[in-house]
Amino acid sequence: MIRLLRVAVWSLGAALLAGCSGLKTYPDTSPKNLFVKTEASSGSAFARVRVAVHIHQVDANCRAEYLGTVQLNEPSVEIGIPVDRLSFLEFSFFSSSFLGGSSGTIHYTTLLRPRAGHTYDATARYAEGIYHVVIRESDPRQRAGREIERRGLDECGRRA
């Protein structure tokens, strides 16, 4: 009985902490068109790196509304981003050290307006404090794709 009570209290505490973080799971209901490959290495056995992508929809007035987060815990993750609508993607690389007690977050942000019939291949890499994100657009009817130019939220009125 006491063990069951401990498990219930621990589960409730974990749920409360998760709820207090302000992060919610992205409601991934669109057809999968963003394929993210993640490579993250801290370079140390005493440190850890976590990678996530926070997805926002952008309205006609260039205001971003947070929709949710996808944790990039697997080497490859498929996400559905609505087509023909401007989205703001925020890749976050969170590093923490067990011995030094230090931590930090690096962000890579860009606007993306997925086109119908196209796929988007993203690579999110982090190694020894250096991050790199590349997003490529591919049209299955054409051989060559193109790299998506990084654009900030302040550029949302400009079509890419």
Indicate residue ranges for each PLM-predicted region.
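Sec-dependent bacterial lipoprotein signal peptides
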Residues: 1-22
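Short loop/turn and low-complexity linker motifs enriched in small/turn-promoting residues
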Residues: 20-114, 118-160
